[in-house]
């Protein structure tokens, strides 16, 4: 494992991975502003020694990009739209989980693109459960769930409504997942009951593994002012955050595959 990714806070043999959640308002963009905000969040997370950075669903273009008159562009490996994020990952030695619209072989996807700490594109998960709304039906659904060994942690990645279905938790569990990362645009209430019920179900169906929910805030387009980012384990919510735009940081024990934090360390953007 790359030693720079971890902090040895309790002496030899206890290596702690710091994970940052960029709980910002992204829903209506514009894309250029969202990109700047993500880069700002990465820089701030680096100041707090965070080595993984999670963003919400469609953080780059904005979840409401199809209902806005603002310009947007889908990311691809050809158009260099990911380049500034790749450079930031290399500069800060971070792994970025980037919620974005992505196009591959002319097929548009609602994706979580993963960029490695060396600044290279690693892989992506495409949202499999695309709801029939204008905000989502532009994207073709993904076909699979994969588990990747990311810095020694077998990690499954899901996008928002993917987390609603217990069978998706079972699929990543079958592949040996030790951690689930969920990027979301999921306000409370919604059309399928409280989101935390789905997240608990996901954790239980994946053998109780920790589940990290990176949600968003803001009121433009969709009211996410009370949307929660959350950490779960063994089918229960450990702690949550809702409110102002903030970078949220937790400690994760890479060896024991356990969440060490009991609450988020919260850095409000307005306080900087």
Question: What do these predicted regions represent?
Answer:
Residues 31, 36, 40-117, 188-209:
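Cys-nucleophile CN-hydrolase/nitrilase-fold catalytic domain and related Cys-dependent amidase chemistry
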Residues 25, 56, 97-101, 182-183, ...:
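A cross-family glycoside hydrolase active-site/sugar-binding cleft signature
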Residues 104-175, 188-201, 254-272:
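Active-site catalytic loop in hydrolytic enzyme cores
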Residues 1-15:
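N-terminal amphipathic/basic-hydrophobic helices that include classical n-h-c signal peptides
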Residues 16-28, 54, 124, 153-162, ...:
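Active-site-proximal beta-strand elements of phosphoester/diester hydrolases
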Residues 81-95, 164-247:
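CN hydrolase (nitrilase-like) catalytic-core segments centered on the catalytic cysteine
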Residues 100, 111-114, 146, 228-231, ...:
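Short beta-strand scaffold segments in enzyme catalytic cores
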Residues 22, 125, 148, 214, ...:
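Hydrophobic residues at beta-strand termini and immediately following loops
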């Amino acid at each position: 494992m790359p030693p720079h990714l971890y902090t040895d806070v309790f002496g030899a043999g206890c290596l702690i991975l710091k994970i940052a959640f960029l709980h910002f308002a992204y829903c209506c963009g514009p894309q250029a502003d969202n990109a700047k905000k993500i880069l700002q969040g990465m820089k701030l997370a680096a100041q707090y020694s965070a080595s993984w950075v999670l963003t919400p669903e469609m953080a780059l273009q904005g979840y409401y990009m199809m209902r806005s008159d603002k310009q947007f562009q889908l990311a691809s490996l050809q158009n260099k739209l990911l380049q500034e994020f790749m450079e930031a990952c290399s500069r800060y030695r971070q792994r970025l989980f980037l919620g974005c619209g992505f196009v591959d072989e002319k097929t548009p996807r609602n994706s979580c693109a993963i960029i490695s700490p060396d600044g290279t594109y690693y892989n992506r998960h495409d949202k499999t459960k695309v709801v029939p709304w204008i905000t989502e039906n532009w994207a073709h659904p993904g076909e699979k769930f994969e588990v990747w060994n990311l810095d020694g942690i077998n990690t499954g990645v899901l996008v928002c409504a993917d987390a609603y279905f217990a069978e998706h938790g079972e699929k990543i569990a079958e592949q040996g997942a030790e951690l689930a990362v969920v990027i979301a645009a999921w306000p409370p209430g919604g059309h399928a009951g409280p989101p935390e019920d789905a997240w608990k179900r996901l954790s239980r169906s994946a053998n109780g593994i920790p589940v990290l929910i990176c949600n968003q805030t803001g009121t433009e387009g969709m009211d996410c002012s009370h949307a929660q980012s959350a950490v779960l384990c063994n089918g229960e919510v450990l702690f949550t955050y809702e409110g102002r735009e903030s970078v949220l940081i937790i400690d994760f024990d890479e060896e024991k595959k356990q969440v060490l934090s009991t609450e988020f360390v919260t850095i409000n953007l307005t306080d900087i």
